[in-house]
């Protein structure tokens, strides 16, 4: 699902949940897209120009989520939970930590070791060549 279509679906789901509708999780796979969050300076983290990326079919989107720069692409399952944190007595920080714990436990089921870094939000995994990858949670407040 293209990122902008998923974003529109999230906005619609959010409006329904705020109006008292059922909480839900949207599960999607995006074509190649790089999103920038509200944190300034994300462009510095690109290793190619936006022109080079768009020429290769990578969409560039400025989003309203928190954070910096994120790539989504084929083969990645992206989960967008649309929930009422207050109804579950959760703060944003507590919710993020519970997501991290859930991801670590899920990775264990597949024989993958994931860990948290107190200095950086997200779950870190090491590949067979020793490279680290981050699984970041994103949030949007209403």
Q: What annotation goes with each model-predicted range?
A:
Residues 1-134:
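N-terminal lobe of the biotin/lipoate ligase/transferase fold
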Residues 135-142:
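Short, intrinsically disordered, charge-balanced linker/junction segments flanking boundaries
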């Amino acid at each position: 699902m293209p990122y902008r279509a998923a974003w529109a679906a999230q906005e619609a789901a959010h409006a329904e949940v705020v109006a008292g509708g059922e909480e839900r999780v949207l599960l999607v796979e995006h074509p190649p897209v790089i999103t920038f969050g509200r944190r300034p300076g994300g462009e510095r983290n690109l290793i190619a120009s936006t022109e080079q990326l768009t020429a290769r079919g990578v969409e560039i989107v400025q989003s309203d989520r928190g954070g910096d720069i994120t790539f989504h692409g084929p083969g990645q399952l992206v989960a967008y939970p649309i929930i009422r944190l207050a109804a579950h007595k959760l703060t944003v920080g507590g919710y993020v930590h519970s997501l991290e714990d859930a991801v670590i436990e899920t990775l264990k089921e597949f024989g993958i070791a994931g860990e948290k870094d107190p200095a950086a939000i997200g779950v870190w995994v090491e590949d067979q060549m020793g490279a680290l990858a981050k699984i970041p949670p994103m949030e949007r407040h209403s």
